[in-house]
Amino acid sequence: MITFPNAKINLGLNITEKRPDGYHNLETVFYPIPLEDALEITILNDSKQKFVLHQSGLEISGEPETNLVVKAYLLLEQEFQLPPVDIYLYKHIPSGAGLGGGSADAAFMLKLLNEKFNLHLADEKLEEYAAILGADCAFFIKNKPTFAEGIGNIFSPVDLSLKGYQLVLVKPDVFVSTRDAFSQIQPHYPDHSLKEIIRRPVSEWKNCMFNDFEKSVFPQYPVIEEIKKELYSKGAIYAAMSGSGSSVFGLFSPEEKITKMDFEAAFCFQTELK
C-alpha cells in the first residue's frame, strides 16, 4: 500500500510571544502544495525485526530509529500490536526547508497504517497521535488550508483557495538552524491578525503579510533574500520564505504564463496549484 505525503508552505508567520517553557507562540497559515514524497509499507516476513526502513531519493541524515515515519509506526505498533513492516520512503521534499516534509511523512504513515490494518481511527484520534510526533504533524491529517497558533499546534480551518496560481519554490543549498532563525526575533503582536489578512486579495499580501523569520535569516544567509528578490523581479505577486527557511516560494497570477525557471545551485519546484 502506497501513499504520497505532500509538503506545505507558510503564508505569513508572526512570532507573537515567548512562553515560560522557552518555546514561542506564533500564528501562521499552512497551505498544502503538491510537492510529494512516496511512502509504501508491506508486511515484513522476517518477524525477528519490527521494521526495516528503505530510503531513496534525497539523502536523509540520522539513524532509522530517529526518522519520523519509524516513530509513527512504533507509536501505533505499541498500541495495536501491529505486525512487522518493510517501510519504503522516497524523499523528494527537501529537508530543513520549512516545508514540513518529515511531519508530512509521519502523518501519512499514521493514515496509511490506519487504512492497511483497519484500525478505524477517526481523524481526530489520528491528530492526537500526530501531535505526539511533532507540533505541525497533525495539520497533515486533514491536509487542508489551516490557521495555526500556539506553537503551531492549535488549528482552525481557513477558507482559502489558490487554485490556478503558479507556484515556484526554490531551496538553496544552505541549512538554517532553528536557533539561528530565532536569534534576532523580537516577539510582537501584529496590528492585524493573519486571520484577517489572509482574506484579502493575493495582490495585497506583499505589503501586509510577512514572515518574521526573514528579519534574522536574511542577514545571515543573503542568498535566501536574493532568491526572494529574484522571484519578484520575475513577476511574482507574492513571495516569502516558508517557515524558518531555507526555501522561498513565489506565487504568480493565474493569467500569467510563466516559463520554466532555473536558479543556480538550488532545488527548484514549479507547478500550477489545483
UniProtKB/Swiss-Prot annotation:
SUPFAM superfamilies: GHMP Kinase, C-terminal domain, Ribosomal protein S5 domain 2-like. The keyword Calcium does not apply. Catalyzes the phosphorylation of the position 2 hydroxy group of 4-diphosphocytidyl-2C-methyl-D-erythritol. This is 4-diphosphocytidyl-2-C-methyl-D-erythritol kinase. It is an enzyme of class 2 (transferase). It catalyses: 4-CDP-2-C-methyl-D-erythritol + ATP = 4-CDP-2-C-methyl-D-erythritol 2-phosphate + ADP + H(+). It comes from Bacteroides fragilis (strain YCH46). Pfam families: GHMP_kinases_C, GHMP_kinases_N. Keywords: ATP-binding, Isoprene biosynthesis, Kinase, Nucleotide-binding, Transferase. HAMAP family: IspE (MF_00061). The lineage of its organism: Bacteria, Pseudomonadati, Bacteroidota, Bacteroidia, Bacteroidales. The gene is ispE. Its EC number is 2.7.1.148. Belongs to the GHMP kinase family. IspE subfamily. ATP binds at P94, S95, G96, A97, G98, L99, G100, G101, G102, S103, A104. The keyword 4Fe-4S does not apply. GO terms for biological process: isopentenyl diphosphate biosynthetic process, methylerythritol 4-phosphate pathway; terpenoid biosynthetic process. One of its GO terms (molecular function) is ATP binding. The active site is at K8, D136. InterPro entries: GHMP_kinase_C_dom (IPR013750), GHMP_kinase_C_sf (IPR036554), GHMP_kinase_N_dom (IPR006204), IspE (IPR004424), Ribosomal_Su5_D2-typ_SF (IPR020568), Ribsml_uS5_D2-typ_fold_subgr (IPR014721). Gene3D superfamilies: 3.30.230.10, GHMP kinase, C-terminal domain. It comes from the Bacteria. Pathway: Isoprenoid biosynthesis; isopentenyl diphosphate biosynthesis via DXP pathway; isopentenyl diphosphate from 1-deoxy-D-xylulose 5-phosphate: step 3/6.
